[in-house]
Amino acid sequence: EFADNLDSDFKVRQFLAKELAKASVSRIVIERPAKSIRVTIHTARPGIVIGKKGEDVEKLRKVVADIAGVPAQINIAEVRKPELDAKLVADSITSQLERRVMFRRAMKRAVQNAMRLGAKGIKVDVSGRLGGAEIARTEWYREGRVPLHTLRADIDYNTSEAHTTYGVIGVKVWIFKGEILGGMAAVEQPEPAAQPKKQQRKGRK
């Protein structure tokens, strides 16, 4: 049963990614409560997904139900700040690269927008034949702090690919939103065991 669910989840994601390519979809969450499927689409442009009077969502629901073979429910969640969502930032950079915008300008714009909206730090990494160069290379741009080794750091990471006339350019984005301090049980430090006192020897007179 798990294998079947995994396969249908993959097909649902594939279908939605293709259908909603222009709807700025950040992520798709699939849940399976008792013989049904619930799909939550996180998007920056809910109007495009919903369509006129909810027509488009109804079409999606029918197709998802057919793929999964169980009744489907589709929820739309709006992403309020797309500039602070790593997937949407990466997709925005790739769409600019495909429109032949200079890669440095696209990177800088994304970084400035994220920092303006309250990100603690952001790093953008692009690799490939940048600017149509013969030899592929990697360039990155960072502003603020991006602590990748700090476990409590809330870092949003995602990737995207730009298909240009020169080949594929990979884009990676890390956005540092702050540190998660609550929610973790504090580990009590064990008290050091009492050291036995050394008996002082009386010196010989």
Swiss-Prot record:
GO molecular function per UniProt: rRNA binding; structural constituent of ribosome
Keyword check for Nucleotide-binding: no
SUPFAM superfamilies documented for this protein: Prokaryotic type KH domain (KH-domain type II), Ribosomal protein S3 C-terminal domain
Residue ranges of domain KH type-2 in the record: 12-80
Keywords, comma-separated and alphabetical: Ribonucleoprotein, Ribosomal protein, RNA-binding, rRNA-binding
Pfam family, one: KH_2
Keyword presence, rRNA-binding: yes
InterPro entries: KH_dom (IPR004087), KH_dom-like_a/b (IPR015946), KH_dom_type_2 (IPR004044), KH_sf_prok-type (IPR009019), Ribosomal_S3_C_sf (IPR036419), Ribosomal_uS3_bac-typ (IPR005704), Ribosomal_uS3_C (IPR001351), Ribosomal_uS3_CS (IPR018280)
CDD domains to which the protein is assigned, alphabetical: KH-II_30S_S3 (cd02412)
Any single Gene Ontology cellular-component annotation: cytosolic small ribosomal subunit
GO annotation terms (biological process): translation
Family listed: Belongs to the universal ribosomal protein uS3 family.
NCBIfam families in the record: rpsC_bact
Reported function: Binds the lower part of the 30S subunit head. Binds mRNA in the 70S ribosome, positioning it for translation.
PANTHER family named among the record's database cross-references: 30S/40S RIBOSOMAL PROTEIN S3 (PTHR11760), SMALL RIBOSOMAL SUBUNIT PROTEIN US3C (PTHR11760:SF19)
Oligomer status and interactors: Part of the 30S ribosomal subunit. Forms a tight complex with proteins S10 and S14.
This protein's name: Small ribosomal subunit protein uS3
Lineage: Bacteria, Pseudomonadati, Pseudomonadota, Gammaproteobacteria, Enterobacterales
